[in-house]
């Protein structure tokens, strides 16, 4: 969780006006007027206007694809044509921000879908380019005026190679067995960045090539993708929920927030996702299962806490009491790390940091980032695990020691990540790692088939260490599945994936409570425990309960409500409000545990 990201709202208002002016309708039986065959084949380099996202989808007179897609799109590096014209800063850590990277993206088509073979952040060979890209499944189809060619579109994200944000985009092209048209893309939304200071959109044509080839293990990939479709949590529009409970109960769901900063929000009720629109500068995003979010510090909970709970289930709850110094080479010039445990690091209570000694009241963000920003940025940009550890161990310690007071520090969570990596390698061998454990033993059993993250960069081709402080890229479906696991005591389909006792502690279902944050809402003071932000809430009966949640930079919020619902709001700036909790309570009253 980083401090509030202040967006340049006026730019987005301009974009929205431009889009509304350019939207065109395609009545049934009429040919499309936007992104036509001629547009895609001629690829006018001056055509860089954002257009409505719906034009990247099948028209009303579309039919099935006329060709099977099997091969690689070869995309060259090209300047991004952005609004505003220049991205600031122009380079970050020596890497250019204005250029799309050169990539080869392999796809296959099946059942009307265009499916990437590699469903992860793609690496490129240019050390001077800032961006990584990840593609998600799209669609293939045909339209009458495309001269016998087929059409395809797909969603993707861009993210900085050291960042935790996601810039949401969509692309389309024509293809047949001989070749492809130009690729038309546009970048239309984003989560809050850290280094990038320009909220931008981008659009343009790219001349691409189609390298046709058989898809290796196509049978297995098709089987896996069809299972992925079967495992999707149903997504329903907000209007469906309104028709069930009445719009008056939902009216202030996003109250207290800046509407222009909300990308989407919603409720997960009885394994159905009821979502508000996926807002962008070009209208609603047309791929709800393919809109991937960089959720920043929500990763501490959805990845970090869940990984610790999985280790506790495998090795015992005592892993929370393991000392960091027994698993890492600590180079600090003080003894502050001597008694710091894995649990202390997850609780943000290491007693390490450059903040003040002011404790009455304590402020959880005292000393966070801006207290020593130059030092923070050096640590942030350090590529390898050893360099990151050496930087973080230079931080001073407080007099009070571990376990006493909470101070929010990404660096402590990274120390935990490195220690967890050391632990699993000692137990399971040098090839074991936390990310593989999470994918194989938690995410895949939940039906999360594709999820991505970032690692440190090590020399000699060695695998990197997982970031836990930020780096997870998820969809609302992923959020619903992880939340359901936590709401279900860590059990899924009769299999206990997470340690039930420690999970109950994290959710305040035992007598153990976390440390005060110095923050409060209208119901009382908040606290922090095991990466969860706990917000007090007064029930209709007058009892006070605690609502645990994940939070991320820019206002990313997920609340695990004790009535079994999950509320989420994904944003890129602005203030928080209590509306989600109030609405959930109206639909299904929250009750205090007896």
Segment roles from a protein language model:
Residues 9-18:
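Bacterial N-terminal signal peptides
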Residues 21-287, 585-594:
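N-terminal leader/targeting segments and the immediately adjacent pre-domain N-terminus
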Residues 29-56, 61, 70, 314-353, ...:
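Active-site helix/loop module of the DD-peptidase/beta-lactamase fold
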Residues 240-265, 333-448, 474-480, 484-488:
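Active-site-adjacent helix/loop patches that line small-molecule binding or acyl-intermediate pockets
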Residues 294-319, 345, 416-420, 479-482, ...:
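Active-site SXXK
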Residues 305, 412-422, 469-492, 555-572:
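Active-site-proximal alpha-helical segments within enzyme catalytic domains
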Residues 436-513:
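Active-site-proximal binding-pocket segments
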Residues 450-457, 508-577:
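Active-site Gly/Thr loop motif
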């Amino acid at each position: 969780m980083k401090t509030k990201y202040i967006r340049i709202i006026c730019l987005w208002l301009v974009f929205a006006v431009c889009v509304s002016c350019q939207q065109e309708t395609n009545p049934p039986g009429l040919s499309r007027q936007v992104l036509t065959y001629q547009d895609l084949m001629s690829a006018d380099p001056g055509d860089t206007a954002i257009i409505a996202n719906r034009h990247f989808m099948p028209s009303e007179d579309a039919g099935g694809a006329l060709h099977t897609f099997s091969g690689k799109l070869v995309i060259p590096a090209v300047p991004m044509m952005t609004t505003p014209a220049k991205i600031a800063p122009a380079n970050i850590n020596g890497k250019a921000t204005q250029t799309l990277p050169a990539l080869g993206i392999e796809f296959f088509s099946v059942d009307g879908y265009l499916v990437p073979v590699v469903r992860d952040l793609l690496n490129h060979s240019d050390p001077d380019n800032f961006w990584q890209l990840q593609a998600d499944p799209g669609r293939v189809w045909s339209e009458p005026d495309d001269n016998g060619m087929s059409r395809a579109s797909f969603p993707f994200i861009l993210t900085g190679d050291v960042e935790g944000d996601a810039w949401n985009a969509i692309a389309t092209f024509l293809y047949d067995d001989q070749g492809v048209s130009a690729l038309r893309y546009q970048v239309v939304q984003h989560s809050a960045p850290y280094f990038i200071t320009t909220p931008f959109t981008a659009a343009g044509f790219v001349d691409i090539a189609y390298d046709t080839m058989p898809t290796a293990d196509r049978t297995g990939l098709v089987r896996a993708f069809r299972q992925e479709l079967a495992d999707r949590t149903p997504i329903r529009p907000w209007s469906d929920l309104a028709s069930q409970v009445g719009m008056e109960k939902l009216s202030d769901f996003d109250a207290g927030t800046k509407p222009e900063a909300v990308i989407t929000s919603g409720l997960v009720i009885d394994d159905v996702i009821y979502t508000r629109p996926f807002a962008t500068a070009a209208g609603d995003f047309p791929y709800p299962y393919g809109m991937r979010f960089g959720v920043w510090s929500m990763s501490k909970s959805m990845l970090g806490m869940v990984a610790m709970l999985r280790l506790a289930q495998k090795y015992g709850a005592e892993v929370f009491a393991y000392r960091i110094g027994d698993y890492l080479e600590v180079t600090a010039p003080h003894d502050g790390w001597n008694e710091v445990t894995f649990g202390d690091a997850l609780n943000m209570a290491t007693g390490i940091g450059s903040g003040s000694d002011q404790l009455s009241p304590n402020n959880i963000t005292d000393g966070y980032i801006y207290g020593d920003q130059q030092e923070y940025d050096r640590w942030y940009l350090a590529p390898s695990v050893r360099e990151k550890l050496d930087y973080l161990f230079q931080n001073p310690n407080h007099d009070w020691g571990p376990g006493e007071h909470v101070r929010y520090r990404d660096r402590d969570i990274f120390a935990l990540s490195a220690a967890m990596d050391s632990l699993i390698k000692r137990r399971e061998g040098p090839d074991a790692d936390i990310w593989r454990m999470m994918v194989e033993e938690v995410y895949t059993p939940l039906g999360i088939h594709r999820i991505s993250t970032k690692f440190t960069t090590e020399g000699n081709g060695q695998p990197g260490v997982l970031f836990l402080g930020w780096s997870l890229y998820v969809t609302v479906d992923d959020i619903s599945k992880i939340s359901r696991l936590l709401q279900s005591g860590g059990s899924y389909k009769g299999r206990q994936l997470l340690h039930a006792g420690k999970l109950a502690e994290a959710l305040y279902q035992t007598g153990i409570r976390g440390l005060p944050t110095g923050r409060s809402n209208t119901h009382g003071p908040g606290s922090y425990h095991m990466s969860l932000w706990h917000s007090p809430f007064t029930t209709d009966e007058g009892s006070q309960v605690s609502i645990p949640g994940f939070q991320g930079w820019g206002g990313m919020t997920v609340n695990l409500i004790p009535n079994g619902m999950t509320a989420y709001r994904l944003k890129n700036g602005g203030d928080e409000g209590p509306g989600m909790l109030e609405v959930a309570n109206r639909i299904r009253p929250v009750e205090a545990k007896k």
